[in-house]
Amino acid sequence: MALPGTLRFGVLMALPGALASGADPEDGVGSSVVTIVLLLLLLLLLVTALALAWRRLSHASGGYYHPARLGAALWGHTCRLLWASPAGRWLRARTELESPEESGPPEDEEDAEDFVIDGGPEEAAAKEEEQRCQAEQTRDPRDTDSDGGLGLSSQGPVGSGSSAEALLSDLHAFSGSAAWDDSAGGAGGQGLRVTAL
């Protein structure tokens, strides 16, 4: 069943070349227009396939890969990197010196704006949970070994900055453990092997 699909794809890929090679020199303008139209149709087909694949992935993951969520995460990461940079610290210090009496809108107004902008109670609750998790992580970053862990901490080497922290926080989605048995029913089996990811 895969052969007809592969055959169709091969014909589709070879069609612009075959049309361009069989043309007369006087007919060069017409064949280039046909080639461009075919390439644009191929591009449209690829974009449509990408959109359908993304929609299926988003539906299967419960919206985890939605562009709004990914964009918000990327924007938050960019803002954290900006504020951690020397230019961001300088900008923050400068704005604090210029207007210390203006503290901005009260928190209740900010929460109401976030609730309206974010689109509802589900997303607001998710953002609150995310902020609470970040606050717990930043509250006691040096005490990671007290939980009985493997001695791995989210702090990188001295001077590594926020890029190492961002890398380790991105790896959180891949954490877990696995167990398997390599023995094929033989008497010399060693039992289950366990690894932590």
Curated annotation (Swiss-Prot):
Superkingdom to which the source organism belongs: Eukaryota
InterPro entries from the UniProt entry: PTPRCAP
Residues with the Phosphoserine modification: S99, S103
Entries under Pfam families matching the protein: PTPRCAP
Primary location group: membrane
Name by which UniProt lists this protein: Protein tyrosine phosphatase receptor type C-associated protein
Keyword Transmembrane helix: yes
Gene Ontology terms: cellular component: plasma membrane
Membrane topology summary: Single-pass membrane protein
Residues that span the membrane, as ranges: 33-53
Organism phylogeny: Eukaryota, Metazoa, Chordata, Craniata, Vertebrata
Source organism of this protein record: Mus musculus
Keywords: Membrane, Phosphoprotein, Transmembrane, Transmembrane helix
Compartmental location: Membrane
Tissue specificity annotation: Leukocyte-specific. Expressed in B- and T-cell lines, in spleen, thymus, and bone marrow of adult mice, and in embryos.
